[in-house]
Amino acid sequence: MVNKYVILLFAIIVLFIGGCSSAGSETGMLQGKVTIGPISPVERPGETPTIPCEVYEARKIMVYDERGNKLIQQIDIDCDGRYRAELKPGIYTIDINRIGIDSSTDVPQKVEIKSSTTVRLDIDIDTGIR
């Protein structure tokens, strides 16, 4: 009788450990750099203005299902313009939440996330300020 419980306990532990160890490898990474500009109507050639953190924080990277219909995740952009997120393997449509007249020729774009790999997507946002 004791042997049955020991075997059952051992089987449960093996299943639990096996389930935990494979979970980490079942995701991929999406990361990139966002550039935003211009941020003022007059920018002199050769000058690179400092982008305030609030400009990045107001925008998000939007991850939709493959068709672009269902929002899967919103990704924050840090004060240096970088973003990073773990996603399950699959095909996603990546876009931005547009503020005012923001535009980008880089998105929307489909990306394929594979297990244990990183996809890089850099996005240039034109604020439309002239």
Give short role names for the model-derived ranges:
Residues E66-D80:
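Short, acidic Ser/Thr/Gly-rich low-complexity loop/linker segments typical of extracellular
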Residues G90-G100:
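A short, solvent-exposed beta-strand micro-motif common in secreted/extracellular proteins
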Residues F16-G19:
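C-terminal motif of bacterial Sec signal peptides marking the signal peptidase cleavage site
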Residues G28-I36:
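A short, amphipathic beta-strand motif
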Residues I36-G68:
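Short, ordered, surface-exposed loop/turn motifs in non-cytosolic proteins
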Residues G32, I77-A85, I123:
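Glycine-centered loop-to-beta-strand initiation motif
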Residues S21-A23:
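Bacterial signal peptide processing site
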Residues I99-I125:
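Structured interaction patches on ligand/partner-binding surfaces of diverse proteins
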